[in-house]
């Protein structure tokens, strides 16, 4: 069976995702499509708008054959780690191809850039460090500037969010397993960060979340496949944003000793001091973010750091594993065929996992489900089994 991997958040699953999924299967001639999906919290350091099990249902209903959770310690990191660990999981699952959407749309250019960086990695990394020192900027901006100086923007514009992720997928493949085929398609219409829905059928997940958070499911439905609409109508919990967790974060920042926060992942350069001061003054999370923004700290950096503090994520290495969230019969058949040759631990029953392996994800779920209306999902990692979809 030919397998194609995709890296997703489905926050929530919309028409653009359906197009991407269909093209992934068509263009790579895949027999099975495996999605590595963020769990309770997503890459920009935000809570997912829906629990991971509802988003897994959406993925399976739309045609994904297997959904695997990207551990929270990797899912909420910058593009390098996010991509490296996603590729590590897909490689362990023996995928033949990785398919992604990008603003650029030309697979060969991602591979060319990645190969060049791998060949000159030491000098490239040195240039990034110099940019960090000289310009007192964020790591993401330093990386982007170094890339632009090395390649210009004609080869690949890494200021675009999906281009930079795609580049890091290509980089990870070059380092881990160059036999994996990398293929992309150009994103159409809605940009990743567009906050307004302005097309008949395609809108960004950001714009759709804005509609859902405003209670406008009917308007959001224009941009969702029928299967997602049905799942949303049957969902009786709240739609979530950072504001749901602001009181928890504010308490954590106010009560903690400054040196206690130094061992938290992503906490460096005294950012915790600024956060603690900002937390005492901000009424809402949006106020907190605005008061924290500087040239050095992007929104994403602030949110990721805030999330690590909320989750009490210590700055220690995490081990990768394969946590199955859901499968259809094709996915089950594929897993059964390859199970003996998969190098990472496979988790289908959390209670049987090695001690400590899922500790951070279990804590993330427990914190995520503290919000009123999510009582049915509390301790869900233990009582909600992998979702098995029958194929008709």
Swiss-Prot record:
<keyword id="KW-0436">Ligase</keyword>
<keyword id="KW-0820">tRNA-binding</keyword>
<dbReference type="GO" id="GO:0016879">
    <property type="term" value="F:ligase activity, forming carbon-nitrogen bonds"/>
</dbReference>
<keyword id="KW-0694">RNA-binding</keyword>
<dbReference type="GO" id="GO:0000049">
    <property type="term" value="F:tRNA binding"/>
</dbReference>
<dbReference type="InterPro" id="IPR008513">
    <property type="entry name" value="tRNA(Met)_cyd_acetate_ligase"/>
</dbReference>
<dbReference type="GO" id="GO:0005524">
    <property type="term" value="F:ATP binding"/>
</dbReference>
<keyword id="KW-0067">ATP-binding</keyword>
<feature type="binding site">
    <location>
        <position position="162"/>
    </location>
    <ligand>
        <name>ATP</name>
    </ligand>
</feature>
<dbReference type="GO" id="GO:0006400">
    <property type="term" value="P:tRNA modification"/>
</dbReference>
<comment type="function">
    <text>Catalyzes the formation of N(4)-acetylcytidine (ac(4)C) at the wobble position of elongator tRNA(Met), using acetate and ATP as substrates. First activates an acetate ion to form acetyladenylate (Ac-AMP) and then transfers the acetyl group to tRNA to form ac(4)C34.</text>
</comment>
<protein>
    <recommendedName>
        <fullName>tRNA(Met) cytidine acetate ligase</fullName>
        <ecNumber>6.3.4.-</ecNumber>
    </recommendedName>
</protein>
<dbReference type="InterPro" id="IPR014729">
    <property type="entry name" value="Rossmann-like_a/b/a_fold"/>
</dbReference>
<dbReference type="Pfam" id="PF05636">
    <property type="entry name" value="HIGH_NTase1"/>
</dbReference>
<dbReference type="GO" id="GO:0005737">
    <property type="term" value="C:cytoplasm"/>
</dbReference>
<comment type="similarity">
    <text>Belongs to the TmcAL family.</text>
</comment>
<feature type="binding site">
    <location>
        <begin position="187"/>
        <end position="188"/>
    </location>
    <ligand>
        <name>ATP</name>
    </ligand>
</feature>
<feature type="binding site">
    <location>
        <position position="101"/>
    </location>
    <ligand>
        <name>ATP</name>
    </ligand>
</feature>
<keyword id="KW-0547">Nucleotide-binding</keyword>
<feature type="binding site">
    <location>
        <begin position="7"/>
        <end position="20"/>
    </location>
    <ligand>
        <name>ATP</name>
    </ligand>
</feature>
<keyword id="KW-0963">Cytoplasm</keyword>
<keyword id="KW-0819">tRNA processing</keyword>
């Amino acid at each position: 069976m030919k397998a194609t991997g995709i890296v997703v958040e489905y926050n929530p699953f919309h028409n653009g995702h359906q197009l991407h999924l269909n093209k992934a299967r068509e263009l790579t001639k895949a027999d099975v499509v495996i999605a590595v999906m963020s769990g309770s919290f997503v890459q920009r350091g935000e809570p997912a708008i829906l629990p991971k099990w509802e988003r897994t249902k959406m993925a399976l209903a739309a045609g994904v054959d297997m959904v695997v959770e990207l551990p929270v310690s990797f899912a909420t990191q910058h593009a390098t780690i996010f991509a490296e660990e996603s590729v590590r999981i897909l490689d362990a699952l023996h995928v033949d191809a990785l398919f992604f959407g990008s603003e650029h749309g030309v697979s060969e250019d991602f591979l060319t850039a990645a190969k060049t960086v791998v060949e000159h990695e030491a000098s490239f990394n040195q240039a990034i460090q110099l940019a960090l020192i000289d310009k007192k900027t964020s790591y993401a901006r330093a990386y982007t500037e170094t890339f632009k100086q090395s390649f210009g923007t004609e080869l690949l514009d890494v200021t675009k969010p999906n281009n930079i992720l795609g580049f890091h997928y290509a980089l990870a493949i070059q380092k881990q397993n160059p036999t994996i085929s990398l293929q992309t398609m150009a994103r159409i219409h809605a940009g990743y960060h567009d906050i307004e829905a302005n097309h008949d059928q395609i809108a960004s997940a950001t714009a759709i979340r804005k509609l859902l958070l405003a209670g406008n499911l009917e308007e959001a439905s224009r941009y969702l496949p029928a299967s997602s609409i049905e799942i949303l109508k049957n969902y009786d919990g709240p739609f979530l944003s950072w504001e749901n967790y602001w009181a928890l974060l504010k308490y954590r920042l106010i009560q903690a000793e400054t040196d206690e926060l130094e061992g938290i992942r992503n906490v460096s350069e005294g950012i915790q001091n600024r956060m603690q001061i900002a937390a005492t003054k901000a009424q809402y999370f949006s106020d907190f973010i605005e008061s924290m923004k500087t040239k050095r700290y992007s929104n994403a950096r602030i949110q990721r750091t805030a999330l690590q503090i909320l989750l009490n994520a210590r700055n220690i290495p995490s081990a990768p594993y394969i946590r199955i969230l859901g499968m259809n019969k094709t996915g089950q058949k594929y897993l059964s065929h390859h199970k003996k040759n998969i190098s990472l631990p496979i988790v289908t029953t959390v209670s049987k996992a090695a001690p400590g392996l899922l500790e951070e994800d279990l804590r993330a779920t427990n914190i995520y489900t503290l919000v009123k209306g999510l009582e049915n999902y509390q301790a869900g990692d233990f009582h909600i089994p992998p979702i098995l979809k029958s194929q008709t």
